[in-house]
Amino acid sequence: MVKDFSFFIYDYESFGVNPATDRPAQFAGIRTDADFNIIGEPIMFYCKQTNDYLPAPEAVMVTGITPQECNEKGLSEPEFAANILAEFSQPNTCVMGYNNIRYDDEMTRYTFYRNFIEPYEYSWKNGNSRWDLLDLVRACYALRPEGINWAYDDDGMPSFRLEKLTKANSIEHENAHDAMADVYATIAMAKLIKEKQPKLFQYFFENRGKKEIEKLVDTGAMTPLVHVSGMLGNYRGNCTWVAPLAWHPTNQNALIVCDLTGDIDNLLAKSADELRADLYTKKLELEERGVSSVPLKLVHINKCPILAPAKTLLPETANRLGIDRQLCLDNLAKLRASFDIREKVADIFNEERQFASNDNVETELYNGFFSNADKNNMAILRSLPAEKLSEHGLAFEDKRILELLFHYRARHFYKTLTRAEQIKWKKYRQNKLEKSAVEFEASLQRLVEXHSDNSEKLSLLQQVYEYGIKLLG
């Protein structure tokens, strides 16, 4: 490990569950050393909300943060994003949270994208990286649970909710869903796992990157691996043996694996077209038709997946989780005996799924990488004073940038818009708010009825209602 390595543990609170369309409310982060000892001052700030966005009332119920509080205490989104970048981009930083790979990192990327900050470099440039404690916690429960007090839901299934785990392990965690409280709780859980299961911690830390994971994978021999993922289900500790079959035909970061506890006969018997249809059909619908789920899964090697050699799943561990190792070995033999399985699974994933057309440039982050020239010009945009943004004189290769720039100016520097641009923005804003209004009002109604005897919740809902009415005019 490099000498000046540090973790930056962070968390967002937000106004919705979709990082592409919802907005951050609060950011908190703390820098620690490799042993999770705090070495930096805690950082927390709010983000002002723009007038083209309605918050989800449910989110306010969870966090207790209102848009009015954000607008009173917060930074503009460009400042908010720049402050986060300053922390994340310090050399040899490993950015980590609790479910950050699937949520917080996505919120970061979309926030950076809207504000002309390159959305990926913070997690790989200058010796930087990322990791997710949630998957490590799942792996610890499945593979080496000793030393941790585990939490369970009423149905007896393990719970990996941070507030339940901290309570089970007597870790202070007041104000759950306050970003700073969640950061302290994440640090404490990480320290606990490193202390109680140091070998497991070190193995998955050292093997979190793409290059290390690629070394584990042998699609030619279909060498089985242990895989832990929330997609696999709590009933088996989110754990299984998988056989790596092939690399995705169009996504170099995706590995096609087969769950060796699944219905392999069905996989071998059906055509690629039949399997593709089943793969994108809801599990409940398949069950109603008496059809078994397709035992295929994509593992994204750029998302710090939990993969380890098959021997990591000890016989006694497999028994505890209800995983039949002999069934897995028998299924592996069937796969290895199939002459066309690799070709078939590649074919399944080769046909692009058709998605509804999208006219919102702000959700098009993954529609391509920006060229170096565009990245340089975006950095220039960020440095320009507001009055110069309309006469930047820069040539962009990517058509998304000019539309993003219009939104950026309209939200943060409205007075710099021409009369025609103001009319265009008013029309865009009105259309966007009207689309959100029906669900916003229905959510408020549901929540008012559900919390009719809770004055604190009703006060929050009243504030959200007043905020929404003001935006909707």
Swiss-Prot record:
Positions of the record's site feature: Important for interaction with ssb: 144
Keywords: DNA damage, DNA repair, DNA-binding, Exonuclease, Hydrolase, Magnesium, Metal-binding, Nuclease
Annotated positions binding Mg(2+) 2: 13, 182
Site (Interaction with single-stranded DNA) location in chain: 109, 120, 124, 138, 210, 253, 302, 366, 369
Catalytic activity line of the entry: Exonucleolytic cleavage in the 3'- to 5'-direction to yield nucleoside 5'-phosphates
Cofactor note text: Binds 2 Mg(2+) ions per monomer.
Residue ranges of domain Exonuclease in the record: 9-188
Listed name of the protein: Exodeoxyribonuclease I
